[in-house]
Amino acid sequence: MERTLTILKPDCVRKQLIGAVINHIERAGFRVVAMKKIHLTKEAAGEFYAVHRERPFYGELVDFMSSGACVPMILEKENAVADFRTVIGATDPAEAAEGTVRKLYADSKGENIIHGSDSVENAAIEAAFFFSTEEVVRSN
Protein backbone atom coordinates (compact mmCIF):
# COMPACT_ATOMS: atom_id res chain seq x y z
CA MET A 1 0.00 0.00 0.00
CA GLU A 2 1.42 3.38 -1.02
CA ARG A 3 1.26 6.58 1.00
CA THR A 4 1.20 10.24 0.07
CA LEU A 5 1.15 13.48 2.01
CA THR A 6 -1.41 16.19 1.55
CA ILE A 7 -1.89 19.53 3.26
CA LEU A 8 -5.22 21.31 3.40
CA LYS A 9 -3.84 24.82 3.06
CA PRO A 10 -4.86 27.92 5.05
CA ASP A 11 -7.42 28.99 2.42
CA CYS A 12 -9.17 25.62 2.78
CA VAL A 13 -9.32 26.03 6.57
CA ARG A 14 -10.46 29.68 6.36
CA LYS A 15 -13.26 28.75 3.94
CA GLN A 16 -14.41 25.95 6.29
CA LEU A 17 -13.90 23.30 3.63
CA ILE A 18 -11.96 20.74 5.70
CA GLY A 19 -14.88 18.30 5.92
CA ALA A 20 -15.88 18.68 2.28
CA VAL A 21 -12.34 18.09 1.03
CA ILE A 22 -11.73 15.10 3.32
CA ASN A 23 -15.05 13.64 2.15
CA HIS A 24 -13.92 14.08 -1.47
CA ILE A 25 -10.60 12.36 -0.68
CA GLU A 26 -12.22 9.43 1.14
CA ARG A 27 -14.81 8.94 -1.62
CA ALA A 28 -11.87 8.60 -4.02
CA GLY A 29 -10.70 5.56 -2.04
CA PHE A 30 -8.02 7.07 0.18
CA ARG A 31 -7.65 6.15 3.84
CA VAL A 32 -6.46 8.85 6.28
CA VAL A 33 -3.72 7.29 8.44
CA ALA A 34 -2.48 10.50 10.10
CA MET A 35 -3.94 13.98 10.48
CA LYS A 36 -3.43 17.10 12.59
CA LYS A 37 -4.34 20.78 12.53
CA ILE A 38 -1.36 23.09 12.95
CA HIS A 39 -0.22 26.66 12.27
CA LEU A 40 3.13 26.68 10.50
CA THR A 41 5.67 29.33 11.43
CA LYS A 42 7.37 31.15 8.56
CA GLU A 43 10.52 29.19 9.39
CA ALA A 44 8.74 25.83 9.21
CA ALA A 45 6.94 26.76 5.98
CA GLY A 46 10.25 27.90 4.50
CA GLU A 47 11.90 24.63 5.49
CA PHE A 48 9.07 22.52 4.08
CA TYR A 49 9.11 24.39 0.75
CA ALA A 50 12.93 24.78 0.62
CA VAL A 51 12.98 23.05 -2.77
CA HIS A 52 11.29 26.18 -4.17
CA ARG A 53 13.67 28.66 -2.48
CA GLU A 54 15.04 30.00 -5.78
CA ARG A 55 11.63 30.28 -7.44
CA PRO A 56 10.01 33.74 -7.73
CA PHE A 57 6.89 32.64 -5.81
CA TYR A 58 8.78 31.27 -2.78
CA GLY A 59 8.25 34.30 -0.49
CA GLU A 60 4.53 34.49 -1.24
CA LEU A 61 4.19 30.73 -0.73
CA VAL A 62 5.89 30.86 2.68
CA ASP A 63 3.77 33.86 3.72
CA PHE A 64 0.58 32.12 2.60
CA MET A 65 1.38 28.78 4.24
CA SER A 66 2.13 30.54 7.54
CA SER A 67 -0.93 32.83 7.35
CA GLY A 68 -3.27 30.46 9.20
CA ALA A 69 -3.95 26.91 10.26
CA CYS A 70 -3.44 24.01 7.88
CA VAL A 71 -4.18 20.29 8.04
CA PRO A 72 -1.41 17.90 6.98
CA MET A 73 -2.52 14.31 6.41
CA ILE A 74 -0.94 11.05 5.35
CA LEU A 75 -3.16 9.14 2.96
CA GLU A 76 -2.95 5.51 1.95
CA LYS A 77 -4.12 3.73 -1.20
CA GLU A 78 -2.67 1.66 -4.03
CA ASN A 79 -0.89 4.08 -6.40
CA ALA A 80 -1.56 6.86 -3.87
CA VAL A 81 0.79 9.55 -5.20
CA ALA A 82 -0.32 9.51 -8.84
CA ASP A 83 -3.98 8.89 -8.04
CA PHE A 84 -4.03 11.75 -5.54
CA ARG A 85 -2.50 14.17 -8.04
CA THR A 86 -5.39 13.29 -10.36
CA VAL A 87 -7.97 13.80 -7.58
CA ILE A 88 -6.68 17.26 -6.66
CA GLY A 89 -6.19 18.52 -10.22
CA ALA A 90 -3.79 21.00 -11.81
CA THR A 91 -2.06 23.60 -9.63
CA ASP A 92 -4.01 26.34 -11.41
CA PRO A 93 -7.72 25.72 -10.77
CA ALA A 94 -8.54 27.31 -14.14
CA GLU A 95 -6.65 24.42 -15.77
CA ALA A 96 -7.92 21.71 -13.40
CA ALA A 97 -10.26 19.01 -14.67
CA GLU A 98 -13.94 19.15 -13.73
CA GLY A 99 -14.73 17.46 -10.43
CA THR A 100 -11.21 17.81 -9.00
CA VAL A 101 -10.63 19.37 -5.58
CA ARG A 102 -8.99 22.47 -7.02
CA LYS A 103 -11.63 22.97 -9.72
CA LEU A 104 -14.38 22.71 -7.10
CA TYR A 105 -12.86 24.75 -4.27
CA ALA A 106 -9.73 26.74 -5.21
CA ASP A 107 -9.70 30.43 -6.09
CA SER A 108 -6.28 30.86 -7.71
CA LYS A 109 -2.96 29.25 -8.52
CA GLY A 110 -1.44 30.82 -5.41
CA GLU A 111 -4.28 29.87 -3.08
CA ASN A 112 -5.18 26.46 -4.42
CA ILE A 113 -6.62 24.72 -1.33
CA ILE A 114 -4.36 21.66 -1.19
CA HIS A 115 -0.84 20.25 -1.47
CA GLY A 116 -0.07 16.77 -2.78
CA SER A 117 3.32 15.06 -2.85
CA ASP A 118 4.81 14.74 -6.34
CA SER A 119 6.66 11.43 -5.85
CA VAL A 120 6.77 8.43 -3.53
CA GLU A 121 10.19 9.58 -2.30
CA ASN A 122 9.00 13.11 -1.54
CA ALA A 123 5.85 11.75 0.10
CA ALA A 124 8.00 9.89 2.64
CA ILE A 125 10.19 12.94 3.29
CA GLU A 126 7.19 15.26 3.61
CA ALA A 127 5.28 12.86 5.87
CA ALA A 128 8.28 12.66 8.21
CA PHE A 129 8.37 16.48 8.34
CA PHE A 130 4.93 16.56 9.98
CA PHE A 131 4.46 13.18 11.68
CA SER A 132 6.37 10.86 13.98
CA THR A 133 5.91 7.13 13.48
CA GLU A 134 3.72 7.05 16.61
CA GLU A 135 1.27 9.46 14.99
CA VAL A 136 0.64 7.23 11.97
CA VAL A 137 -2.15 4.68 12.40
CA ARG A 138 -1.58 1.36 10.70
CA SER A 139 -4.37 0.59 8.28
CA ASN A 140 -6.48 -2.51 8.86
From Swiss-Prot:
As cofactor, the record names:
Mg(2+)
Residue positions of the active site: H115
The record's catalysed reaction(s) read:
a 2'-deoxyribonucleoside 5'-diphosphate + ATP = a 2'-deoxyribonucleoside 5'-triphosphate + ADP; a ribonucleoside 5'-diphosphate + ATP = a ribonucleoside 5'-triphosphate + ADP
Q: Which UniProt keywords apply?
A: ATP-binding, Cytoplasm, Kinase, Magnesium, Metal-binding, Nucleotide metabolism, Nucleotide-binding, Phosphoprotein, Transferase
Q: Which domain of life is it from?
A: Bacteria
The GO biological-process annotations, alphabetized, read as: CTP biosynthetic process; GTP biosynthetic process; UTP biosynthetic process
Q: Which GO terms describe its molecular function?
A: ATP binding; metal ion binding; nucleoside diphosphate kinase activity
| Gene3D superfamilies listed in its UniProt record | Nucleoside diphosphate kinase-like domain
- Which EC numbers characterise this protein's activity in its record? 2.7.4.6
Tell me which CDD domains the record gives. NDPk_I (cd04413)
One cellular component term (GO) for this entry is:
cytoplasm
Residues annotated as binding ATP: K9, F57, R85, T91, R102, N112
What InterPro entries does the record point to?
Answer: NDK-like_dom (IPR034907), NDK-like_dom_sf (IPR036850), Nucleoside_diP_kinase (IPR001564), Nucleoside_diP_kinase_AS (IPR023005)
Compartments in which it is found = Cytoplasm
The record's section on SUPFAM superfamilies has: Nucleoside diphosphate kinase, NDK
The record's function comment reads: Major role in the synthesis of nucleoside triphosphates other than ATP. The ATP gamma phosphate is transferred to the NDP beta phosphate via a ping-pong mechanism, using a phosphorylated active-site intermediate.
**Assembly mode:** Homotetramer.
Q: Which family does it belong to?
A: Belongs to the NDK family.
Protein name per its UniProtKB record: Nucleoside diphosphate kinase
Q: What organism is listed for this UniProt entry? A: Chlorobium chlorochromatii (strain CaD3)
